[in-house]
Amino acid sequence: MALPDFTMRQLLEAGVHFGHQTHRWNPKMKPYIFGDRNNVHIIDLAQTVPMLSRALQVVSDTVASGGRVLFVGTKRQASEIIADAAKRSAQYYVNARWLGGMMTNWKTISNSIQRLRKLDEILASEASGFTKKERLNLEREREKLNRALGGIRDMGGTPDLMFIIDTNKESIAIDEAKRLGIPVVAVIDSNCDPDQIDYAIPGNDDASRAIALYCDLIARAAIDGIARQQGASGRDLGASEEVPVEPALEEASEA
């Protein structure tokens, strides 16, 4: 395997170059702005290309060394895409509301994850002896916990890298990552603060096609890292019970 390829044309077709209206910009983004068109900032894709390539390398290297990547995107148009990409690449995700202390208070989060596992056991048991109302309340509790924590229930600890869509919306997640020294890969739109991000990707963070492109590339970089890790350990990937789905095969099955 190798790092996923992408082209300037793909970025253009996905609308990665469209920033926000000029009056909404963050002046710190000036180095990444190509110009403006109809009062909308145009992001300099000549900078996005190498910065995205660098981010993909960081993701692959993190996973290849046994690290965990947490995908974060809770806005409506990112939620499902974030979850799908993380699952496809055997990583972790938060796609509902970010709970304060999710990283900095991991012990409390771990207790909630244990409660979620316990509810799974209870509700899977036929001989639980609960009334219909009690069972319904337990199912609601499980659904609420699963929505918040389902994507990190098997993470086993804080991640080694975070990938974030919309740094303004996910500012609490970024603050927690900074406090714990967790590096952050993130898309920075024209209204964002690039100083907070270790591996910034200048680009639109609102268009669903752009979000889908970033997430697909990051997922494929993680899969590349898995292959490198297994190759380095001498493990026979073809003999594994579960193997990552190659993007080319996935596309062929959908065609």
Curated annotation (Swiss-Prot):
Residues 232-255 are annotated as: Disordered. GO terms for biological process: translation. The keyword Ribonucleoprotein applies. One of its GO terms (molecular function) is structural constituent of ribosome. It holds the Pfam family Ribosomal_S2. The keyword Ribonucleoprotein applies. GO terms for cellular component: cytosolic small ribosomal subunit. Keywords: Ribonucleoprotein, Ribosomal protein. Belongs to the universal ribosomal protein uS2 family. This is Small ribosomal subunit protein uS2. It comes from Rhizobium meliloti (strain 1021).
